[in-house]
Structures are given as C-alpha cells and as structure tokens.
Amino acid sequence: MSSPEMVVAECLKAFPEVERVILFGSRARGDAGFRADIDIAVECPTADILRWSDIEEAVELAPTLLNIDLVRLDTAPPELRTAIRHEGRVLYERAERSPAG
C-alpha cells in the first residue's frame, strides 16, 4: 500500500506541466502525527491558471482522507520557497524537464 503522499504524487505525475513534486512540513521532517495534513509543493512553471486549477482539482480528488495543502512553488513567497528547499523531500521529478525560458 502506498503512503498518502505518494498517492498524491502519482496524481500529479499525470500532468506534463508538473516538473517536480516536493513533500514539506511535518511529514518531510518525520515528526507528523497520524492525521497530519500533507504539505505538497509543485513546480510547474509552464502551467497557466486553468491548468493549475485542473491540478488542484486532481489533488482534491486524490483517494486519501487527509487534508492536502498544495503550494505552487513558482508563485510561493520567498520565505516559503526557502523552507521547502531546506526541509523538502522530492517525491517526483520529471526525467525531461523543460528548458528554462
């Protein structure tokens, strides 16, 4: 059986715009309680607002009973991006990442 965070990562892999999925917060640190929410950062710089909405909807429909906090990494505040880079654990990274624009 997959962990709840891997279930979410699997949902996100279906979107070609998703370049990286990063777990952060208490689950990444290893100090989460049984019912702790899942904090997920998504790197998807090419996704427009409609596609981001599709991504959010897919995560809402993920087969888990836990709350999921989804953050778009490219629009997150700098302090949060720094924290995610420091404590985050990459769950998925697309093999072919799009070139920087």
What is the role of each PLM region?
Residues 1-20, 28-34, 43-101:
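Catalytic core of pol beta-like nucleotidyltransferases
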Residues 39-41:
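Short, well-ordered beta-strand segments
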